[in-house]
Curated annotation (Swiss-Prot):
Disulfide links within the chain: 29-43, 36-48, 42-52, 47-56
Keyword Signal among record annotations: yes
Superkingdom classification of source: Eukaryota
Protein name: conotoxin S11.3
Family of the protein in this entry: Belongs to the conotoxin I2 superfamily.
Compartments where located: Secreted
Modified residues (Tyrosine amide): 60
Amino acid sequence: MMFRLTSVSCFLLVIVCLNLFQVVLTRRCVPPSRYCTRHRPCCRGTCCSGLCRPMCNLWYGKRATFQE
């Protein structure tokens, strides 16, 4: 009886550990210069236009400048 109880508890412990590892692996952060979303956040910096960057820079083209 004791062997059966021990094996069942070990089996349940393995299932719990596997579930925890799955949560940790799916919630990990994205390194810099990689694709990011709101569900996959950046490790450092912010998600700018789908890429992890240290800070978001706004790039303006020729059409965005005002000329008199």
